Amino acid sequence: STDVHEDELPVYLFSAAEVILHGFEAQFVWQMSDPFKLTLQGDYIRARLNGGGDLPRTPPLRVAAELAYEQDAISADMRATRYMQQDKTAALETATDGYTLLDASISYRFNLGTSQLTAYVKGQNLTDEEVRVHTSFLKDSTPLPGRSMALGVRGSF
């Protein structure tokens, strides 16, 4: 950001530069038993300008664990995702606190005539964390929504 605002939104100035990127992405999936599956994953990127300094809006280290159950017509899962603090920031960019998201869902599949329907309940951000996504242009003014719950039916015709 240039510290200049127009209609209450920050004005940005971009210029091209050579960068050095290092990172990793890993995923481990374990079918614990027939209905249960555990997934562990993580990713990280380190982005620096070739002449020194950090690239703006670089995502922080992220790690996640998901336990899923699927048997016959029933599916359920619970996922915890931890986003670490991002303090490797560019000039005029603010650091972002880390946060943990906890999401869960359960669904039941059934047939109605020739259509297959799925009834579900899902919850996102169950711990009602204040979430500011470091890669967002509006992170300092607009957090993600808090806890949400949804109940629905999805159909294939």
Language model segments and positions:
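Intrinsically disordered, low-complexity regulatory regions of eukaryotic regulatory proteins
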Residues: 1, 23, 101, 154-156
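Short acidic/His/Gly/Ser-rich catalytic and metal-binding motifs that mark active-site loops
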Residues: 1-4, 129-131
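Flexible, surface-exposed loop regions and adjacent strand-edge segments
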Residues: 3-12, 55-60, 93-98, 135-143
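Gram-negative outer-membrane beta-barrel transporters
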Residues: 7, 11-89, 127
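Outer-envelope beta-barrel architecture signal
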Residues: 34-36, 61-63, 72-74, 100-102, ...
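C-terminal beta-signal and adjacent terminal beta-strands/loops
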Residues: 87-88, 108-157
